[in-house]
């Protein structure tokens, strides 16, 4: 059967299906859009099946009709002839399977609006594991009405209450495992950064210090709150298991091994070592390794970003990041001065207390009279009152320094890290766009080469036969010479040319298919950044900065208000003493 007959039979099958097929395809598209965050595995399987069944070349009227279908950019697999013969039966099977899923599961947006998950990380506690090694665990308190979390939890819903409060303890390794799982499942989503592991702390023994633990506590709490505010990450099943108090979390963590690229893991069953890799991790690591080199080798015309919205977002992120870094430097210097002042006032208070002790000791040795004793006791009391006020002043400076160092500065650093995370996602989109432009250049080059080879495929010229050349033998000889000299026919002396043309045609087909796939990926990623990831980050960042600044203002107000009240009381006592001396 020729290719024309194959595509004609496909056209007849589509004509027989008529509008019913279009309705079914539209239903399947709705399912795909609604369940894109919950049924990723099923979508990949359906897309692969559809890709293997869709013909490579479609008539013009079919292209117009398929613009609204979800398979508009699908390509023909290598076994296209076999799949084309079964396209009708497979498509019908796909639609029959897809139709019952219409009302099974609501979309992630509707679940985000209907249900809420509020998680707070508090109460760090030092504990020992099975091997008697110390670690810090953090208390997760979850208030939610989400059915998935309630189903996994052992806490039962009370009558008259819509929200269930669930508590569970997690250590830093659990947060790291959650981060790795979400990164692998959603590589196109902005992932909130975790606090650094700070391996050097293990060398100095400061991993269990109050300062280090509180800083990590605030960062982990911010990490979880970002996930709860995200429409995709908050609906992830692994996150629901993480916040629940189910005993399956430890089992799931032990059994699921997230492989890393370039790391050898021993296979106990086979008795040898094998290189394990994950597709997403492999792609990300390869991008990180080759990004600098490829960008250096790529022509400068491909490095320019043309999307105005992406440019505006990048410019805003850059300016905000620079401002946050400046604020961090300013408050770090200011906080260091606060710490120095607290130490100075503490030393000043100790010296005043020593003066009161010296005054009492000198009075006891001189044996003064009764009026003198009362006056000297009042002097010692005044020294103690002034020393206590200085000590109160020092404690307030110390508390303010502690809040700025463990909470406010950590929030500024975390906001800067979140900007870097979103910038990395934009950089990934830009690199994908560069790859697409390079593929387009390769396609244009291949087409020009094919056109150059195809230009020689012309009919042989008609030989000129005259009667002056000496008869029919000479004319026949001249005809053969002219025919052999042209070498323009596709059947004589053109096997090498045919091989080149075939290779170029196959290369062009592969490039066109890859460009169609990459174009859709770049378009989806760009729309996701502009319409979802950036607005979600912007909302979260505004809330975090507002809460941080409000917390700093409250601490400053309480600090100065306490100083005013304390020094006002001290001032009244000292003025009263001056009046008595007069």
Swiss-Prot record:
Region: Disordered, residue numbers: 1-111
Biological role: Sorting nexin, involved in the separation or division of vacuoles throughout the entire life cycle of the cells. Involved in retrieval of late-Golgi SNAREs from post-Golgi endosomes to the trans-Golgi network, for cytoplasm to vacuole transport (Cvt), and autophagy of large cargos including mitophagy, pexophagy and glycophagy.
Residues involved in a 1,2-diacyl-sn-glycero-3-phospho-(1D-myo-inositol-3-phosphate) binding: 171, 197, 216
PROSITE patterns, alphabetized: PX
Top-rank lineage group of the source organism: Eukaryota
Domains: entry comment: The PX domain binds phosphatidylinositol 3-phosphate which is necessary for peripheral membrane localization to the perivacuolar punctate structures.
Source taxonomy: Eukaryota, Fungi, Dikarya, Ascomycota, Saccharomycotina
Keywords tagged on the record: Autophagy, Coiled coil, Cytoplasm, Endosome, Lipid-binding, Membrane, Protein transport, Transport
Protein name in the entry: Sorting nexin-4
InterPro entries given in the database record: AH/BAR_dom_sf, PX_dom, PX_dom_sf
Family: Belongs to the sorting nexin family.
Comp. bias (Acidic residues): 57-70
Domain (PX): residue spans on this chain: 116-249
A Gene Ontology term for the protein's cellular component: phagophore assembly site membrane
CDD domains cross-referenced by the UniProt entry: BAR_Atg24p (cd07628), PX_Atg24p (cd06863)
Pfam families, sorted: PX
Annotated source species: Debaryomyces hansenii (strain ATCC 36239 / CBS 767 / BCRC 21394 / JCM 1990 / NBRC 0083 / IGC 2968)
């Amino acid at each position: 059967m020729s290719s024309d007959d194959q595509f004609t039979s496909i056209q007849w099958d589509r004509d027989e299906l008529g509008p019913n097929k279009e309705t079914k395809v539209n239903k399947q598209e709705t399912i795909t859009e609604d369940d894109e965050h919950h049924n990723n595995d099923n979508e990949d399987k359906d897309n692969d099946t559809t890709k293997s069944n869709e013909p490579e070349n479609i008539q013009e009227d079919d292209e117009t009709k398929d613009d609204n279908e979800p398979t508009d950019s699908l390509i023909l697999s290598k076994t296209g002839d076999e799949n084309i013969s079964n396209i009708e039966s497979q498509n019908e099977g796909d639609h029959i399977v897809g139709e019952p899923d219409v009302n099974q599961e609501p979309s992630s947006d509707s679940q985000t609006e209907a249900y809420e998950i509020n998680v707070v990380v508090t109460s760090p506690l030092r504990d020992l594991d099975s091997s008697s090694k110390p670690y810090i665990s953090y208390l997760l308190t979850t208030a939610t009405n989400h059915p998935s979390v309630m189903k996994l939890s052992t806490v039962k819903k009370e009558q008259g209450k819509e929200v269930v409060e669930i508590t569970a303890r997690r250590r830093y390794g659990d947060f790291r495992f959650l981060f790795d799982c979400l990164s692998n499942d959603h590589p196109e989503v902005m992932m909130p950064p975790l606090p650094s592991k700070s391996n050097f702390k293990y060398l100095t023994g400061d991993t269990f210090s109050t300062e280090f633990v509180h800083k990590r506590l605030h960062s982990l709490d911010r990490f979880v709150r970002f996930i709860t505010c995200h429409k995709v990450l908050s609906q992830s099943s692994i996150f629901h298991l993480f916040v629940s108090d189910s005993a399956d979390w430890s089992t799931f963590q032990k059994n699921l091994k997230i492989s890393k690229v370039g790391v050898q893991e021993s296979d106990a069953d086979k008795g040898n070592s094998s290189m394990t890799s994950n597709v997403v991790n492999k792609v990300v690591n390869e991008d990180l390794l080759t990004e600098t080199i490829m960008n250096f080798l790529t022509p400068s015309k491909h490095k320019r970003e043309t999307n105005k919205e992406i440019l505006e977002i990048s410019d805003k992120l850059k300016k905000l990041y620079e401002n946050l870094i400046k604020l961090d430097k300013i408050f770090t210097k200011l906080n260091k001065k606060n710490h120095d002042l607290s130490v100075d006032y503490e030393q000043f208070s100790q010296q005043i207390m020593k003066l009161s002790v010296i005054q009492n000791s000198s009075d006891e040795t001189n044996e003064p009279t009764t009026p003198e004793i009362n006056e000297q006791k009042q002097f010692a009391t005044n020294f103690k009152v002034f020393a206590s006020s200085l000590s109160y002043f020092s404690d307030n400076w110390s508390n303010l320094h502690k809040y700025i160092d463990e909470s406010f500065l950590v929030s500024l650093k975390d906001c800067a890290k979140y900007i870097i995370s979103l910038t990395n996602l934009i950089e990934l989109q830009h690199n994908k766009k560069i790859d697409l432009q390079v593929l387009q250049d390769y396609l244009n080059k291949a087409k020009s080469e094919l056109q150059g080879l195809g230009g020689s495929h012309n009919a042989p010229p008609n030989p000129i036969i005259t009667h002056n050349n000496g008869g029919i033998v000479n004319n026949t000889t001249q005809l053969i010479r002219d025919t052999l000299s042209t070498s323009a026919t596709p059947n004589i002396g053109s096997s090498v040319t045919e091989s080149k043309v075939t290779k170029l045609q196959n290369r062009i087909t592969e490039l066109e298919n890859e460009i169609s796939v990459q174009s859709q990926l770049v378009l989806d990623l760009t729309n996701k950044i502009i319409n979802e990831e950036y607005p979600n980050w912007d909302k979260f960042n505004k809330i975090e900065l507002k809460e941080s600044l409000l917390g700093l203002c409250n601490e400053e107000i309480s600090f100065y208000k306490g100083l005013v009240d304390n020094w006002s009381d001290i001032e009244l006592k000292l003025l009263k003493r001056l009046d008595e001396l007069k």
